[in-house]
């Protein structure tokens, strides 16, 4: 990571367009998203003073109950994108693709409010987006039914103690932090490089009884620490907000797992390919990390429907590769014993 210079997000976007003029529309769209993010940040920052942001309403496209802040964020980002060179939007909060400007060159996939379960309790929430070129034709879904490698940019926003805007336009991943006084995002982490290996993993361990064998074995061996085949101790982290875990991995490494499991409807996990896993994968790869569905590269997956789900494993390259070894039978085997099963956590 090179030393940040405090330059603004606008400065960075200008430099990217100077480097590649074809990114002008993408840069304009990112500016619109950043402006909306500042507004959403102000609402989140007011907490209960802004009303009951956790109030439940209707169900969204995936069957989740929408909360008030979900709706607020969706409306604000849609308003922003109406002013951008965007033809179509696929949002978690809309069942179908929303058409905006006919003939515009870009399509945006967005999760307006990631981490909805954290609303109302003072924990981190965020926004995730991916930008793609429009696919010409009459099918408004076609622009999104392409591999993640077609993305021209991706990013996420973390609304926490600080508001950060994490973005890539295919030339490295950077973090900009909101200067609340000036309402400007300023560069604080330049040209991020994820360390190849680290001693942290993130997974929702409450689902252990539903995991398949490879995931159970990987986590078991992490938990055994220096007494197991990984030969070192690990810490577990889980924030219930993908953006927060992703930002932590970008800064200090580790591995994040949201696997598929044997619950009904969870064979492909819970995260959505277009507006969660593909954008995160782009950002992680641009920072020197890896992102897979456990075995195959996320960026090469092609959605067959707008709200398609995908398992997700991302982070330090050696850790992601290690997970893949468990799936294909190459995992470490030294010292595996029934002791851990007797403790109960990983018993099938």
Curated annotation (Swiss-Prot):
Which reaction is recorded as catalysed by this protein? beta-D-fructose 1,6-bisphosphate + H2O = beta-D-fructose 6-phosphate + phosphate
> Which residues of this UniProt protein bind Mg(2+) 1?
92, 111, 113
Localization: Cytoplasm
Q: Which organism is it from?
A: Methylorubrum populi (strain ATCC BAA-705 / NCIMB 13946 / BJ001)
Q: What is this protein called?
A: Fructose-1,6-bisphosphatase class 1
Family to which the UniProt record says this protein belongs: Belongs to the FBPase class 1 family.
Q: Which GO terms describe its cellular component?
A: cytosol
So where does substrate get bound?
114-117, 204
Spell out the InterPro entries in the cross-references. FBPase_C_dom (IPR044015), FBPase_class-1 (IPR000146), FBPase_N (IPR033391), FBPtase (IPR028343), Fructose_bisphosphatase_AS (IPR020548)
PROSITE patterns given in the database record: FBPASE (PS00124)
Pathway, per Swiss-Prot/TrEMBL?
Answer: Carbohydrate biosynthesis; gluconeogenesis
Name the residues that bind Mg(2+) 2: 111, 114, 276
Q: What is its main location?
A: cytoplasm
One GO BP annotation here? Answer: gluconeogenesis
Q: Which cofactor does it need?
A: Mg(2+)
Encoding gene, per UniProt annotation? fbp
Q: What class of enzyme is it?
A: hydrolase
The molecular function terms of the Gene Ontology recorded here are: fructose 1,6-bisphosphate 1-phosphatase activity; magnesium ion binding
